[in-house]
Design a protein with these regions (language model features):
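Two-component/phosphorelay signaling modules centered on CheY-like receiver
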Residues: 14-32, 98, 120
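Short amphipathic alpha-helix used as the core "switch/output" element in two-component signaling
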Residues: 64-77
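Conserved acidic carboxylate
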Residues: 11
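Active-site residues of response regulator receiver
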Residues: 55, 84
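The feature encodes the CheY-like receiver
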Residues: 59, 88, 107
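C-terminal output helix
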Residues: 90, 108-117
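Acidic catalytic/metal-coordinating carboxylates
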Residues: 36, 62-65
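Acidic, metal-coordinating helix/loop segments flanking the phosphotransfer/catalytic sites
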Residues: 33-51
Length: 125
């Protein structure tokens, strides 16, 4: 098992997930990507995740379903962060209720995402 922090990017847009992969790999992280709820759950169960960057609008449904399934399997990531294009209080409240450490409005500038990731990973929450 690698000592590099494992970042799982749950994103169905290949350009976005590819950019996040490069961003995190170049800054010393081990990165997995998954385009769907099923793929995200499969990766997280097989390989414990330090930071989950979770798009709420996955092609096969509500991204928060990932957290529900991982909780059932006892495989929740150390830190889960929701990424959404919807800046609505009820969306943020749902994310928090499901255990998200933070909710970021897309698009998230790369520097901001990296700075926040360092904070989340150093605190573990």
């Amino acid at each position: 098992m690698s000592s590099l922090p494992h970042v799982l990017v749950a994103e169905d847009n290949d350009l976005v997930s590819g950019a996040m992969r490069v961003l995190f790999e170049e800054t010393g992280h081990r990165v997995s990507t998954a385009p769907s709820i099923a793929a995200t759950v499969s990766v997280a169960v097989a390989d414990p995740v330090d930071l989950l960057l979770l798009d709420l609008g996955l092609a096969d449904g509500d991204g928060l379903e990932v957290l529900a399934q991982l909780k059932e399997r006892g495989a929740l990531p150390r830190v889960s962060v929701a990424l959404t294009g919807r800046d609505e209080p009820e969306v943020v409240a749902r994310c928090r209720a499901m255990g998200c450490t933070d909710v970021l409005l897309k698009p998230v500038p790369a520097r901001q995402l990296l700075a926040r990731a360092r904070e989340w990973l150093s605190s573990g929450t």
